[in-house]
Swiss-Prot record:
Coiled coil: none annotated. CDD domains: F1-ATPase_epsilon. One of its GO terms (molecular function) is proton-transporting ATP synthase activity, rotational mechanism. F-type ATPases have 2 components, CF(1) - the catalytic core - and CF(0) - the membrane proton channel. CF(1) has five subunits: alpha(3), beta(3), gamma(1), delta(1), epsilon(1). CF(0) seems to have nine subunits: a, b, c, d, e, f, g, F6 and 8 (or A6L). Belongs to the eukaryotic ATPase epsilon family. This is Putative ATP synthase subunit epsilon, mitochondrial. InterPro entries: ATP_synth_F1_esu_mt (IPR006721), ATP_synth_F1_esu_sf_mt (IPR036742). One of its GO terms (cellular component) is mitochondrial inner membrane. Gene3D superfamilies: ATP synthase, F1 complex, epsilon subunit superfamily, mitochondrial. Mitochondrial membrane ATP synthase (F(1)F(0) ATP synthase or Complex V) produces ATP from ADP in the presence of a proton gradient across the membrane which is generated by electron transport complexes of the respiratory chain. F-type ATPases consist of two structural domains, F(1) - containing the extramembraneous catalytic core, and F(0) - containing the membrane proton channel, linked together by a central stalk and a peripheral stalk. During catalysis, ATP synthesis in the catalytic domain of F(1) is coupled via a rotary mechanism of the central stalk subunits to proton translocation. The gene is atp15. One of its GO terms (biological process) is proton motive force-driven mitochondrial ATP synthesis. Keywords: ATP synthesis, CF(1), Hydrogen ion transport, Ion transport, Membrane, Mitochondrion, Mitochondrion inner membrane, Transport. It is found in: Mitochondrion; Mitochondrion inner membrane. The lineage of its organism: Eukaryota, Fungi, Dikarya, Ascomycota, Taphrinomycotina.
Amino acid sequence: MAFAWKKNFSYSKYASICSQTVRQALKPEIKNEVKTHGDAEFLYTRWKNGAQEKTESYNSAKSADKE
């Protein structure tokens, strides 16, 4: 049984399915609170020809609002 399970699912896929199922089962009040836990914010800098260019920030919550 374990061999068949490993053949079809990686642990990452299994964890993704479990977390998605739990999120779908939550009450609406809690769902809104949980959605914000997945947001990511970070800074990144592009490099070109060995020189640093402008540093930019990224916020997944703001980019999701634009869509």
